[in-house]
Amino acid sequence: MPSDGRCWETLRALRNSSKGRLRYDREWLLRYEDVLEECMSLPKLSSYSGWVVDHILPNTSHHTQENAPSSDNSPSSGSASGLYQSTLKSPVRSSPQSPSPSTPSGTQSAHESPFTEPIALQSSRAIKVEGCIRMYELAHRMRGTEGLRQWQEEQERKVQALSEMASEQLKRFDELKELKLHKEFRDLQEVMEKSTREALGHQEKLKAEHRHRAKILNLKLREAEQQRVKQAEQEQLRKEEGQIRLRSLYTLQEEVLQLNQQLDASSQHKDLLNVDLAAFQTRGNQLCGLISGIIRTTLESGYPTAENQAEAERVLQEMRDLLSNLEQEITRASEMKKKDEEEARVKLQESQVQQGPGAPTKTSAPSPSLVGTQSEDLQVKVQDSTMQWYQQLQDASAKCVLAFEDLTSSKDSQIKKIKMDLQKAATIPVSQISTIAGSKLKEVFDKIHSLLSGKPVQSGGRSVCVTLNPQGLDFVQYKLAEKFVKQGEEEVASHHEAAFPIAVVASGIWMLHPKVGDLILAHLHKKCPYSVPFYPAFKEGMPLEDYQRMLGYQVTDSKVEQQDNFLKRMSGMIRLYAAIIQLQWPYGSRQEAHPHGLNHGWRWLAQILNMEPLSDVTATLLFDFLEVCGNALMKQYQVQFWKMILLIKEDYFPRIEAITSSGQMGSFIRLKQFLEKCLQRREIPVPKGFLTPSFWRS
């Protein structure tokens, strides 16, 4: 190309120029950097350089090519000479009115009249150099543009190829992914089908097992139902048999009691025949107690068994044998008496014959009958004096009830209200007795004493007085005594320590109001006949329920309370009685004797030891009485008391043990261990809950 030749010519010219032959210091840049910075500003071309490149340089280049020598050895010289010879006017000298060649309008006017005015140009060489530079830049720019265009095309082709390749790879990837998904789906479908088949097989197996188990279960249910029906039939049969046995036991008990009455009736021959029948009566009472214990045990456990019935029949047979032996003994005694009388009559006749008919006759007394050996058996009945005292107390209680009958049977609402107020005023303070403090106990005592003394007291926010009704005092005394005994039956039975605060208040009230004390004893003897001590006897024609009530049992709807509950109530009342006889109200006169003191406790202990023991009852009551009152009796009677304890251990324990069954040995063992421990220590311990002097200061 022509421009390439011009560039080389220019370079040669520059190399051969004076400046081109200059030597440059390479370190100068570091030393004179500041000078260079002043020259580093970008060179600026004339505003008409573009116009020169577009209009003048092409003509000059064309003219130079035409006049250029054909020889290749002098291109640079020709170029240089041309540059130096050319003299043009610079465009700077042009008129200011000439349009700028850079604008389109200026360019158009330049084409119309490019030489309207003479233009002062630089030298042709400078213009040529500048034009060569411009042409070189233009060619370089064009080459760069062409290279860039080719590079862009190449990159576009590569991008397109890469895009096509990526598209193909994406298609292959999608195909592989779809294939993989299809394979996974097929595998999953196969697994699901396999699982379904296995589940169906397992389900069929479970159904078969279920049918098999259902069949077995139905068989078991039928067997269980048959067993249940069989058991129900057996239970019904057992129940019927038990009821039959129970009725039979009642029949046997009734027959035993009747035979025992015959034994008692036979006692009339005791004085006539001079024979001791106490052994027969004692054994008869023991047999009655034994059959009663059998019935009581069977009622607690359900229905009587064949063994119970057999045992009751043995008791009946023994009672019959006992009665037969008694009759034989009476017959034998009667025959012996007749024989003795006959012998005495024969001897009398013989003596009369020997004396002769003239001899005076002597009236000889009949020969004494054979005196049997003193029986060592204990008595069953209580002493006559004790029974008279017991009956007097019951009569006084019944008379007191009759005294306030009008108050209790009245239909008048006002009288009913008075009765309720009096009953609350009498019973609520007793319920408030506790071991909290001595001062609280004194408040309760003062309130009860004030009520009995006719003073008004506050009860339920109202003022109450016994003078509100003429029969009020008798009613209050009766209800108060009843409440004291009821507290022993319930509160003391559950909490043994409660016996002492209740007893000390009752003792203080008894000392100031003796009638209340007699009513307390009457209620106590009625609910607990063993506090007399008294063992009620069965009378002919008496209903069995009435007899059980006389013994102290609670009978509700023909059902007798359980033995444990019965013993618990009896224990509570005996503990209250044992606490009353040893305690005195501390704020009363010390010189006054206790209205029912320890001498009555000694009497009770002596009398109960003179009576035949009852199974489970005697051992329980002895333990409760001695645990509460033993310490006071020991201090009062000392040696005599210990003799009594030794008597219990040596003589009375074997009697209790002989009549106690294996299931009722708990109370006997408890009493035995208690007395053995006391004998070992030579002391009866102070009962738990005993009121000490410090209590009354609280």
From Swiss-Prot:
Q: Which GO terms describe its biological process?
A: poly(A)+ mRNA export from nucleus; protein transport
Q: Which GO terms describe its molecular function?
A: identical protein binding; inositol hexakisphosphate binding; phospholipid binding; translation initiation factor binding
User: What Pfam families does the record point to?
Assistant: GLE1
**Interaction with NUP155: annotated span:** 1-29
Q: Where is the composition biased (Basic and acidic residues)?
A: 333-348
The record's subcellular locations are: Nucleus; Cytoplasm; Nucleus, Nuclear pore complex
Phosphoserine modification sites are: 41, 90, 100, 351
Residue numbers spanned by region Disordered? 62-119, 333-374
Its cellular-component GO annotations read: centriole; centrosome; ciliary basal body; cytoplasm; nuclear envelope; nuclear pore cytoplasmic filaments
Domain of life of the native organism = Eukaryota
UniProtKB keywords: Coiled coil, Cytoplasm, mRNA transport, Nuclear pore complex, Nucleus, Phosphoprotein, Protein transport, Translocation, Transport
Low complexity bias (residue ranges): 67-82
Which parts of the chain are coiled coil?
152-274, 305-355
Q: Where is the composition biased (Polar residues)?
A: 349-374
Q: Where is this region: Interaction with NUPL2?
A: 656-698
Could you tell me which residues belong to the region Mediates the shuttling between the nucleus and the cytoplasm? Answer: 444-483
Role: Required for the export of mRNAs containing poly(A) tails from the nucleus into the cytoplasm. May be involved in the terminal step of the mRNA transport through the nuclear pore complex (NPC).
On assembly, the entry states: Associated with the NPC, however it may not be a stable component of the NPC complex since it shuttles between the nucleus and the cytoplasm. Interacts with nuclear pore complex proteins NUP155 and NUPL2.
Family membership, please give it. Answer: Belongs to the GLE1 family.
Question: Under what name is this protein listed?
Answer: mRNA export factor GLE1
Q: Which organism is it from?
A: Rattus norvegicus
Lineage of producing organism: Eukaryota, Metazoa, Chordata, Craniata, Vertebrata
